[in-house]
Each structure stands twice: as structure tokens, then as C-alpha cells.
């Protein structure tokens, strides 16, 4: 992190005071190298050193990122592991002024590793979530994420598990598809999304991250209520107009897009053009431990690199609350708090 001048420190303090939601965050991608070492000591015959763990997070493209994500998930094996990473993640979020988070958990990857029972692992996540709410005042919802390139049968298992478990766990709020969209578009998941919607689940989708605007059109066509990334929408004026007209929330992840090489240069990121075009954007960290940028940093980038004023940042924070799946009463209270933040 760069050194800060006094006015920079004041701006960061404002960002921390600003109540905001994190809407595009992967539980597994929030595992720091230090915690990965701790997990490795629990499960590996030859544990990782801190240097070795940091090397896993050192990559140059989207494929390298997927391999780093794999290295973390293969060391998440017990309820205690999931409780640990959930509690630590939410504690770090609360320290940045995050009041609510909607967190992707890669249930599809859990099944990929052959762990047939997800419920015991989820029990650990819930313990971590409830401890964090009691200790830090932050709330959280879960979004069960399927891996698109594992296919529709694998996704069906994830989405139906979300519907089944939601009957007893209202913290399970929605479903999504992540993974490598270069291999599989959204269209094959249309019927599964309709089934999930009918089960009372909200619908999200990663789209337009590593492919063109057609990926975003596909996500809209299967009913996604929020779009993760949507980076390439900037190349399709008709799509930009539709997104602005419908006010479909876009979960923008600036540092993520640059670090994975999906956007080659920070200055080229369309976040400012999205905002000026009237899109309903929110700022998010995606995988903060892997991209070395938390939500506070993303707001700082918006201010320092893209010229977003304090009033703009307040608008982005309000967008994050409005785009969340929180009940209306809580949204109204948090929006009031944002207006009162100076």
C-alpha cells in the first residue's frame, strides 16, 4: 500500500466511515496467505511456508488466478476451516466500514473435490457468520456459486441444494455461476435459473469478464438480477443503454479485472464511463487476498485514479445498499446513515 499524505488519510477515514455493502466477494478468495499456511499445517503432509503461500498468489493471467483459487479450495476440508475463514473475512470487512456482505461460496468446487456432504461445512460458515455479527455488527448472506465449465448437471446439484437448505437457513439468499466463461455461456443454465427463481432464490451471474458483450446478454437472457463484472459491456452501445435503462446492478471489480489481465491497464478500466453512462454500478473486491485490494482500496482507487468525488462515493455506497438483497426496512435505515456520513 502506498504512503498517504494527510488529505489521503482523511479521505480513507471518510471511506471507512461510509456504510457500504460488499456484493461481489468470494469466501475462498478472501483467504490470506497467512491463513492458507494455517490451513496447510492442518492438512498437508509438508506444510506450505509463508513464502510458498505467497507464491501461489503470484500469477499474471485469468488461468493463473483459477489455479490459485484451486490451491486454496483444496485445503478447505472441515467445518472448522470454514468457520475460521468466514469469521476472519467478516472481521476485515467490518474494519473497512462494510455493514453487509453477500458472499459467493463455491459449493460447486466442494462437490468437485468429492465432498458429498456440504451441510457440515456450511454449519462452520454459519458459526463464523453469527460470531462475526455478534462481535462486529456486520450481517451477511450466502450465494451458492456453481462452476459453469463443470456443466449443467453439476450446477443443478448446487442450485437445488441452495433451495433445499434455504428452508432452514434464511442467510442463503441466491445462486450464481462463476468459473471460466470462455468455455461455457449462460444459455445452458436458463431452465435451472427459472427453477431457482421459483424456489425463492435471487439470481446472479458472472458475465462479460473474460468474453465479450455476448456473455452479458446471455446472463440477462437467463434472468440474472445482478451481473458480476460486465467489463466488456463498454463495447456494445445497445447493451449499455439497456443496462442503464433497466438499472441492472453491475458488480464492478476494478483491481480484479486488472490483476487477471481481463483489463490490461488500470487507466483503461471503464468504471468511470459506466458511471457517467448512468449504469447502476457497485464497487467490490472479488477476491481481496488474491488481488491485494480490499473494498476500502477499491473506493480509494475510484477517488484517486478515476476522479470520483466524495459525493460520488456516497452514491456508490448507496448503490451497494439498494442493489443488495436486504429487506426494504434495513435498506432505508442504511441509506439514511450514508446521507449522514461526513
Walk through the language-model features, giving the residues of each.
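Metal-cofactor-binding active-site regions of metalloenzymes
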Residues: 1-201, 210-215, 221, 225-226, ...
Amino acid at each position: 500500500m502506498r504512503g498517504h499524505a494527510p488529505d489521503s488519510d482523511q479521505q480513507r477515514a471518510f471511506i471507512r466511515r461510509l456504510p457500504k455493502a460488499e456484493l461481489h466477494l468470494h469466501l475462498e478468495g478472501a483467504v490470506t496467505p497467512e491463513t492458507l499456511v494455517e490451513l496447510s499445517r492442518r492438512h498437508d503432509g509438508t506444510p506450505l511456508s509463508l513464502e510458498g503461500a505467497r507464491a501461489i498468489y503470484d500469477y499474471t493471467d485469468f488461468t493463473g488466478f483459477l489455479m490459485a483459487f484451486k490451491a486454496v479450495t483444496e485445503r478447505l476440508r472441515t467445518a472448522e476451516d470454514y468457520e475460521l475463514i468466514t469469521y476472519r473475512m467478516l472481521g476485515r470487512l467490518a474494519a473497512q466500514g462494510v455493514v453487509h456482505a453477500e458472499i459467493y461460496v463455491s459449493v460447486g468446487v466442494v462437490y468437485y473435490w468429492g465432498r458429498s456432504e456440504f451441510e457440515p461445512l456450511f454449519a462452520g460458515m454459519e458459526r463464523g457468520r453469527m460470531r462475526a455479527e455478534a462481535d462486529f455488527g456486520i450481517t451477511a448472506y450466502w450465494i451458492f456459486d456453481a462452476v459453469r465449465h463443470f456443466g449443467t448437471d453439476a450446477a443443478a446439484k448446487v442450485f437445488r441444494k441452495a433451495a433445499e437448505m434455504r428452508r432452514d437457513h434464511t442467510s442463503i439468499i441466491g445462486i450464481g455461476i462463476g468459473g471460466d466463461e470462455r468455455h461455457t455461456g449462460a444459455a445452458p443454465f436458463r431452465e435451472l435459473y427459472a427453477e431457482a427463481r421459483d424456489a425463492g432464490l435471487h439470481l446472479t451471474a458472472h458475465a462479460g469478464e473474460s468474453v465479450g458483450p455476448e456473455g452479458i446478454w446471455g446472463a440477462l437472457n437467463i434472468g440474472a438480477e445482478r451481473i458480476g463484472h460486465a467489463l466488456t459491456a463498454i463495447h456494445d452501445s445497445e447493451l449499455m443503454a439497456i443496462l442503464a435503462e433497466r438499472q441492472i446492478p453491475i458488480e464492478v471489480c476494478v483491481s480484479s479485472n486488472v490483476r487477471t489481465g481481463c483489463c490490461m491497464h488500470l487507466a483503461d478500466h471503464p468504471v468511470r464511463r459506466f458511471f457517467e453512462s448512468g449504469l447502476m454500478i457497485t464497487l467490490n473486491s472479488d477476491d481481496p487476498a488474491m488481488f491485494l485490494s480490499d473494498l476500502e482500496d477499491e473506493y480509494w482507487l475510484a477517488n484517486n485514479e478515476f476522479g470520483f468525488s466524495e459525493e460520488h462515493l456516497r452514491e456508490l455506497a448507496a448503490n451497494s445498499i439498494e442493489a443488495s438483497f436486504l429487506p426494504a426496512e434495513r435498506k432505508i435505515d442504511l441509506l439514511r446513515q450514508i446521507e449522514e456520513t461526513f
